[in-house]
Amino acid sequence: VSFDKITVKDIVEDCGVNRNTFYYHYSDIYALLDEILENETRRVLTENLTESSWRDAILESCSFALKNKKGIYHIYNSLSRRKIDAYLYQVMGRIMYDFVKMQAEGLSVKDEDLHLIADFYKCAFVGLILQWLDSGMKQDPEYIVDKIFSYLEGSTRNMLENAAERNDRK
């Protein structure tokens, strides 16, 4: 069932509350969805990201999807899919920017370059996560994340050094 087919009636019956209670808190089911995704985004991003915790933050997003697999697919297969995409881009953007900035320590890299490199990684990871969702979340996200970051080891610093070197030449 697509999220678009779920009604307020379905939600209140499933939760054992009345319609007035639902409408007291939310204008519609999309407002409820927005609040759920905003709360999850806030929860993941309020963690102080360190070199080891960025990996955990990515896995936390995947874990949220696995724990809420049925609901995620209802949303993913609906007109509200863009909300999932926006959530992923927002979370991954912050994680990758913080990671890239940490890797740039000691280098004279322009903020514009930091953002571009972070966006590169953000798009790569969101693409992998969307592919994982498309495939039914069958692969272990920890395996995928660990493998990707082992491939990337040193490449982020190399990209940043190249950016700093180009900045120094100008």
How would you name each of these model-derived features?
Residues E35-L37, C62-Y89, M96-Q103, L130:
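Amphipathic alpha-helical segments used for helix-helix packing
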Residues V1-F3, T50, S155, M159:
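Basic, amphipathic alpha-helical hairpins
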